[in-house]
Every structure is written in C-alpha cells, then in structure tokens.
C-alpha cells in the first residue's frame, strides 16, 4: 500500500493519502491496511477496541457535527468530497483549542484522535463517508458536541446552499460552553 502522510495542525490528527488505480471500469483503492496505518502513526491500540463501522450517505450541503463522543475515528470518503473541520478539545494537548479544516476525497484517510471534535459537510449530492469508531453508539447516551454554526469558531462551511443540519447537532452546545465544561472538569 502506497500511503503518504500530510502535515496537519493538530497533534495526532493524521491525514493519509493512497493512490486510486483507474481503468475502464472505474477505480480501485486499498482503503486501509492495519500495518500501514500503524506505520504512519495510527496508535496500535486503536485496533484493540470495540470497533464499529458506520456509513453515512449525505445530500449536498448536509453538515454533521461537531461531534466529540470520546472515540477515536478513522474516516474515509467512498464517494464525493467532504469538508471536514476539527477542534482539539484535549486540555493536555499542545494544540488544545486549535482548529483546522480540509477537503477530503476518495483516496484520503483521516485518523481523528479521541478528544478532537469533528464535523463533515458533503460538498456533493449523495456523498458517502465511511468511518470506524472505537466505541459502540448508544442512541440513549448524551454525547458532547459543538453546534457546527458556532459564531466564535466561524468554520468555513460551504454556505452556497442552506446547510442541512439535524436538530440534535443544531442544538449542541456552543464552543465557549464546551470549553467551560472541559476546563471545570465537569462532564
């Protein structure tokens, strides 16, 4: 597998690229291989967790996030382009409160460490996002999140159309409220 690693601004957030092999049928991609991911910085213990694989298919403009469920994630795009934004919420991190955004396409994998909030917006109709998380989703559990349209964060979402956002995400806490919770050690 021919991975390359790109620089990013948040400690532990990895952006990896792998070539797409095109022919008359379309393309083939080795999405990920455990040994290569470890070689490029994904912690080996990521694979020791109760892993759950999720797939979301999103209409153009759909904005999911900013989620911080306390899991690490390995995110790949199966179809389309997603604008992804990340906020480091790990108080012990040298990049605490740092924000970075990038457009992710097929052939790219993003490893999101536990404690880094993340959101994704589909820039195409029927964008397909695949992600592996280190915990099982429980719909009855309240997870930490930041409203994706937080004015202080002012994330560079595509606003050429009205974003489609779930009520739950829209009603998430503000960035300042989440920081206050984290800095008071109250969860």
Regions found by a protein language model. Give the residues of each.
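Non-catalytic, conserved peripheral segments adjacent to functional cores
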Residues: 1-104, 126, 135-141, 146-187
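Conserved metal-binding segment of the jelly-roll/cupin
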Residues: 103-125
């Amino acid at each position: 597998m021919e991975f390359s690693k790109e620089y990013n601004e948040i400690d532990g957030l990895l952006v990896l690229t792998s070539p797409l092999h095109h022919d008359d049928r379309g393309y083939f991609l080795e999405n990920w291989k455990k040994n290569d991911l470890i070689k490029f910085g994904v912690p080996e213990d990521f694979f020791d967790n109760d892993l759950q694989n999720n797939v979301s298919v999103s209409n153009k403009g759909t904005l999911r996030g900013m989620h911080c469920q306390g899991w690490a994630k390995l995110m790949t795009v199966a179809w389309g382009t997603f604008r992804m934004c990340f906020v480091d919420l790990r108080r012990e991190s040298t990049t605490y409160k740092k924000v970075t955004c990038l457009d992710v396409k097929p052939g790219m994998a993003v490893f999101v460490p536990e404690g880094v909030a993340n959101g994704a917006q589909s820039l195409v109709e029927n964008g397909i996002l695949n992600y592996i998380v280190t915990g099982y989703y429980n719909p009855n559990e309240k997870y930490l999140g930041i409203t994706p349209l937080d004015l202080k964060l002012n994330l560079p979402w595509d606003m050429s159309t009205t974003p489609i956002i779930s009520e739950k995400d829209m009603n998430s806490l503000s960035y300042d409220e989440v920081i206050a919770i984290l800095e008071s050690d109250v969860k």
